Every structure is written in C-alpha cells, then in structure tokens.
Amino acid sequence: MGYLLGVDIGTQGIKGVLLDETLKIVKKAYIEHNYIQPKANWFEHDAEETWWKGFKAIIQKLFTHNSFSPQEIIGIGCSGVSPCMLPVDSRDKPLRNAILYGIDTRAQKEISEITQRLGEKKLLEINKQPLTTQSVGPKILWYKKNEPE
C-alpha cells in the first residue's frame, strides 16, 4: 500500500498528515511555533528554525512508531504561509527573518508610493489587482529603502 503525505506550514504551527490510498487518516501531527513581532504590525518567521527545522520535525513525528517506511510515500502535498518575503544569499541561506504575508503592514508607505507613481488605472492594467499588504513588490521596495545591504 502507498501513502500520501501532507504538510502545512502555517503562521502559528505546522500540521502534518499521512493518508492511505483510500484517503483514510493514518497519522497526524502538529507542532506549534510562534511568529516574531519586532515592532507593531510587523510579523516575521525565522525561516531556518520555523520552516525548515519545523518541517523536518513534523516528518519525524509522522514516521515515528509506524509499521511503514518513507519509501512507501506515493505523493506529497505541501503548503505554507504565503506570500512571504525571504531574501537569501547566493547559497540560498536566509539573510534575515521572512516578512509574513498580509498581516505584516510595514510596506504600507511603499504601496501608496507605487500606486501614486503609476496611478490606479495603470497599476490595475499591469497587476490586474490593487496592491495590498499581500503584494511582494512593495516589500522588495521596503527592503531596498530600509535594509539595502
């Protein structure tokens, strides 16, 4: 028999589930973690600790005390908090904490600047939707202005 593995890396925890081929839950696990809030309305994750180590820990929890092996996995589904912004170096190592999706509002000023510069009509033409705190572009501009290194 084959098994399906699902992992969801969320804002405050990681959920994992193993299903058999009939989609019956064989095992599930949860690991709680916290976001970092360095300032009001700023929300971050330490990607190395929260995402990568958390992912490995949830996999370990799912495969502990089971009568099957990882080789029996026939499908994997993974989801995570997004859109998040995580700058990395040339070796894909995080340069700082990840800025979380729309709950982090530090780029509000950049949203206004871009919208003013392009105009709402042109912005909708290009982007097909207005910029929000979910948008990555304003976060890139925020980095450029505030953490250029």
Regions found by a protein language model. Give the residues of each.
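N-terminal glycine/serine-rich phosphate-binding loop of ATP-dependent small-molecule kinases
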Residues: 1-97, 125
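Generic secondary-structure signature for well-ordered alpha-helical cores
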Residues: 60, 64, 116, 145-149
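Glycine-rich phosphate-binding loop and adjoining helix at the ATP-binding site
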Residues: 86-141, 145-146
